[in-house]
Amino acid sequence: MPKRVVVLGGGSGGTIVANRLARQLDQQVREGDVEIIQIANTEKHIYQPGYLFITFNERQPEHFIRKQDQLVHRNVKLIYDNVTKIEPEKNLLISKKNQYPYDYLVIATGSVPNFDSIPGLAEAAYDFYTLEGSIRLRDALAKIEKGKILLTIDVPHKCPAAPLEITLMLDDYFRKRGIRDQIELVYTYPIGRIHSLQPIADWATPQFEKRNIQYETFFNLERVDPEKKVAITMDGDEHHYDLLISVPAHQGAPVILNSKLGDEDGFIPTDRYTLKMEGSNNIYVVGDATNLPISILTYTA
């Protein structure tokens, strides 16, 4: 029987790993000693860094969408299924209809924004971390002529630079439309500077000041009143807005939470040097599924 390597996840990290294994183990695959399987929960591969370009109508959604089977190496067996549980003690993946044994597993299930973490947030906020969210925000921005845009950020979240990026892009977007003086941009962050990394905060702060972008630190959102359009912080401060853009705290994929492999937020304890799941000799973790405190981008996943 060939050794079976299963890559769980069809995003950038999982696809890169599957393709690299397919090339490096080409001979073993052709000789039947190794089998490489990628399990994706959708036939569509969406390039997530493109969401910001969709938000500002610089590209249409289809520009960032490919069929997953067009992106994987011929040595990779591609399966579309929604795995709901991982059982490491049995070397087994489970879905509603199938079971997938493995000898080695690479978990590349990413992370997702948790809009339910703050009462009222799901009903009130716009986002740019999902395809649907970026389209919805694009349409909302196109209708704005004046008012206050409030950006709230919670941690952890993927792509650490994205909140700063969208804020600067909003400034540019409204300047190009000739209505920047009618728009109040307010950026918030939960700690004592506008980014978790000091060098980035040191660079971004004067950029905000030069562009008349207001910012508020130690801003920790507690709840949102969608009807009154008010964001309330843990300190009890009320902030009115005309449009709320939120980066909520992210959490691990449902399969990780369901399998109890991660911490309370569903991020998997991972050895930073080997990328092995802590306590395992045959499970590896890449990208946003790990609990590693580093900036994770597509090209570092």
Regions inferred by a protein language model and the residue ranges of each:
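FAD-binding core/adjacent interface of flavoenzyme oxidoreductases
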Residues: 1-4, 76-165, 172-178, 245
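A Rossmann-like FAD-binding core segment of flavoenzymes
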Residues: 33-37, 76-93, 174-270
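Conserved beta-strand scaffold positions in the cores of enzyme catalytic domains, especially
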Residues: 38, 78, 125-127, 215, ...
